[in-house]
Amino acid sequence: MRTLKIEPLTKEAFAPFGDVIETAGSDYFMINNGSTRRYHKLATVETAQPEDNAIISIFSAEKLEMPLRIRMLERHPLGSQAFIPLLGNPFLVVVAPLGDVPVPGLVRAFLTNGRQGVNYHRGVWHHPVLTIEKRDDFLVVDRSGSGNNCDEHFFTEDEQLLLDPQSNQ
């Protein structure tokens, strides 16, 4: 079983999968009579159908036991999905490129710095939210509308991957 190498999350490395949502290194302009920096359009919400709505939710996630066998990935074919950490904790991101099914050899893992969020582009394969704290909260921006917006792919036992944060140290 291949152990995923966990990479630091950067805009350049994550670009094939979506957007890194962060203020560091991002352009801004002043608003509110000069008292507020607006970091504008850090990510774009994608929706596939005209009647779709962009919605905001909060996910409260429990830590999964590590090392973790990556048995499945999911994708949202009708809209993007963004996760922004509310408690400032780093979290793990596991992704694979667009395609009919995720290719195990192309799966990548990233570690955020706690001040970064991610916006998965429409159709990008990813693991459900992976907190490394006992519990963590995320502001989630995604799509509401008709049609199935969650495809799941389960790997065969031979294709499964291992996510082990301790192996990177």
Curated annotation (Swiss-Prot):
CDD domains per record: cupin_UAH (cd20298)
InterPro entries assigned: RmlC_Cupin_sf, UAH_cupin, Ureidogly_lyase, Ureidogly_lyase_bac, Ureidoglycolate_lyase_dom_sf
Transmembrane domains' residue ranges: none
Catalytic reaction annotation: (S)-ureidoglycolate = urea + glyoxylate
One GO BP annotation of this record: allantoin catabolic process
Domain of life: Bacteria
GO molecular function, one term: ureidoglycolate hydrolase activity
Cofactor(s) essential for the protein: Ni(2+)
Pathway field: Nitrogen metabolism; (S)-allantoin degradation
Coiled-coil region(s): none
Entry-linked Pfam families: Ureidogly_lyase
UniProt-listed Enzyme Commission number(s): 4.3.2.3
Record key words, sorted: Lyase, Purine metabolism
Keyword Lyase assigned: yes
Family of this protein: Belongs to the ureidoglycolate lyase family.
Summary of the function given for this chain in its UniProt record: Catalyzes the catabolism of the allantoin degradation intermediate (S)-ureidoglycolate, generating urea and glyoxylate. Involved in the utilization of allantoin as nitrogen source.
Subunit text: Homodimer.
Name of the protein: Ureidoglycolate lyase
Phylogenetic lineage: Bacteria, Pseudomonadati, Pseudomonadota, Gammaproteobacteria, Pseudomonadales
